[in-house]
Structures are given as structure tokens and as C-alpha cells.
Amino acid sequence: TYNKFLNILIKKNFRFKKQKKEDNIYMPRLDTQIHGFIDWNWTAKHIVDFINAFGSPYQGATTFIKKKKYFLNNAKFFKNKINFHPFQSGIIFRKEKNSIYIAALGGTIKIKKVSDTISKEDRIVELKLGSRFFTPLKELERAKQLTSIHSSKGIFNK
């Protein structure tokens, strides 16, 4: 935590290590509303990591069922005996009271929270077995083309 880090600095128990230039990397900042769209062609593990990265305190990773936008949160990866075909990615194949299971490449994705643009309330109860989450290609392409700039005046995408 932040307090632990400060205590280490204050007690001078912190040793700085010079970083090698060849180890440096830079990744631009992201804007959830632009870059938070799920690519259902990815592996289940990559999708789970992506959903959780855009989860709380953010709105969640974005996708659609038909034309309705949903935000997925609280994802868990399961390796299973079923080897889903790529065409099955995004299909809700099991439902429980407070969660849904989605087919994906290399495993299953369990989601515990789904909200929409109207309400932050959980929408799992309204989702149907066999429904398919899908993200239009135009959203995925737009996410890769825009860079977010965060400043004191707000977030700008160029």
C-alpha cells in the first residue's frame, strides 16, 4: 500500500536501482470508454485479465448482445474439458443465480456482474442462455487507432 511505501522511504530502507535503458517500455494511457471493448477472438485468459483490468473502480469492459451495450465485471477463468470452437466465443452457455458462464478460446469465463448503460444494477437475471456477447469490429478498430491524453483539463483522444 501507499502508506507502507512511505514508511519504507522515511526509514531509508528503500534502495534505488538504476534501470537499464534496453528494459524501458512505454505504453500509452487508456480511456475505458474508448479502449475497454472486449475482443472475443482472444483467449479466455486474456479476456478475463482484460475484464478485470477495466473493472472496479471503472465501469467494466464493454461488449454487446445484439445492439444493447453491457459492461462486464468480476471475471474468473476456468480451464475445462470442453474445447470450444472459435465460433462459440461469447456465448452464454450456463447461468446461475448470480453468475453466467461464457464460452471462449481455451476455457470458460465466469462473470459475476453485468450492468448496462441505463443502470449500474446487476443485469445477469435478464440475460438468456444461448445469447452471444459480441463487439463490432468498428469499436475494436477505433480502440486501436485512438490514443488517450490525460491532462488537468480532462481526457482527450486523438
Where are these regions (language model features)?
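Short acidic-hydrophobic surface loop/beta-edge motif
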Residues: 38, 61-65, 100-105, 127
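Low-complexity, glycine/alanine/valine/leucine- and proline-rich hydrophobic stretches
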Residues: 78-109
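Glycine-centered flexibility motif
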Residues: 35-36, 60, 87-90, 107, ...
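Active-site-proximal loop/hinge segments within enzyme catalytic domains
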Residues: 1-78, 147-158
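A short acidic-to-branched-hydrophobic micro-motif
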Residues: 64-83, 108-120
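Generic C-terminus detector
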Residues: 105-158
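Short capping/connector residues at structural and topological boundaries
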Residues: 35-36, 43, 97, 114, ...
